A protein has these predicted regions:
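Polar low-complexity intrinsically disordered regions
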Residues: 1, 18-23
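Bacterial N-terminal signal peptides that target proteins for export
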Residues: 1-10
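Bacterial N-terminal signal peptides
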Residues: 9-19
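Small-residue-enriched, tightly packed secondary-structure blocks
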Residues: 24-183
Length: 183
């Protein structure tokens, strides 16, 4: 019996979620402020120029561990903390869904720099959604030199492990909860 063309696509869509790392689709890796401090230290050690970026930014969100994976359909998720001028103000969750050619899984750390009060306010109100055109700078010895803000936002990532091949389209969405809020 010959199957119609769309059956393989349906089968792939059903099987793909089972291949995504559990960190990417579960509630996400948890983070604590001491882990965030260690990640910030690693970022600054790798590129000392980032110390000025941290100091000059109105705010930043640090996600110590983001899990990402997929086969055709992909997802990423991580939990972190949000700072305003170096002071802890809230928690955040990063969520990403992608579609396109992708195979594998990886784990990385991510810092989202918020240049000014407007960018920080958008983040806190849940209005910050990074589209496919937003690009992250991979942490190297001179990442700060390549860092460019787009709509008041810049992203730096540092690989922790894994291997991922991708030419996919998707965006990141962030949630925010102020420290001390119960709802």
């Amino acid at each position: 019996m010959k199957l119609p063309f769309h059956y393989p696509a349906v089968l792939l869509a059903l099987l793909a979620p089972s291949s995504i790392p559990s960190a990417a689709i579960s509630s996400g890796p948890t983070a604590d402020p001491s882990e965030v401090a260690a990640v910030i230290k690693k970022f600054k050690e790798k590129d000392p120029g980032l110390a000025k970026v941290f100091a000059d930014a109105q705010g930043y969100a640090v996600f110590p561990t983001v899990g990402k994976g997929g086969i055709g359909l992909g997802a990423a998720r991580g939990k972190g903390y949000v700072y305003q001028r170096g002071r802890l103000i809230g928690r955040s969750t990063l969520t990403q869904v992608t579609i396109g050619f992708q195979l594998g899984g990886q784990v990385y750390s991510e810092v989202v720099f918020l240049k000014d009060a407007a960018a920080l306010d958008n983040f806190k109100r849940g209005r910050l959604k990074l589209d496919a055109q937003a690009s992250a700078v991979a942490l190297t010895a001179r990442a700060s030199a390549d860092l460019a803000y787009r709509n008041g936002v810049a992203i730096v990532t540092m690989a922790k492990g894994g291997l991922m091949y991708e030419a996919s389209v998707g965006g990141q969405k962030f949630s925010y909860k102020a420290i001390g809020k119960t709802s």
